[in-house]
């Protein structure tokens, strides 16, 4: 497994990024990157587990030649409510989770808004650059019995990028 400098894409056994199957809660992710491939679309506050299969991956993942990255979202706390928020230099996040029906059904909502363009504007050659992106993950999870559960998972994200003419010197 290798990566490329200045990019979030990975290469497994020499393949390009299209040789990898990337899933989020069993749904295919076609572009796992934000902001010209510098940032991942996966908000770590919403992720429970990541499984990487480099070879001999299970048949249910067929259709790709290189690897499978299977990402599972957290299910939310089904016992009590939790809230958190962070404000950072290039990103801010919020997370809400709790029970809908205690012990049985839960929800999770995690959002992230990043503004790396604010940092780029400090550099003379990037003045006037506008770059931001957002992610929202939401999930409702319900345990039907000891062997079965049902869930509804949503991801929404977007990028906003504008490069003013680069200043040289």
Residue ranges and their predicted role:
Residues 11-14, 94-95, 163:
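Short, solvent-exposed polar/charged micro-motifs at secondary-structure junctions
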Residues 4-6, 16, 79, 90, ...:
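Residues that act as N-cap/strand-start positions at coil-to-secondary-structure junctions
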Residues 1-58, 68, 74-75:
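Periplasmic N-terminal accessory/gating domains of Gram-negative outer-membrane beta-barrel systems
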Residues 33-36, 118-124, 163-166:
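Short acidic, glycine/proline-rich loop/turn micro-motifs
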Residues 3-5, 78, 102, 147:
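A cross-taxa feature marking solvent-exposed loop/turn segments within ectodomains of secreted
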Residues 149-169:
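Flexible loop and strand-edge segments within Gram-negative outer membrane beta-barrel domains
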Residues 21, 49-60, 66-74, 81-128, ...:
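Predominantly transmembrane beta-strands of Gram-negative outer membrane beta-barrel pores used
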Residues 30, 115-117, 158-160:
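Feature marks short, surface-exposed loop/turn motifs that line or immediately flank catalytic pockets
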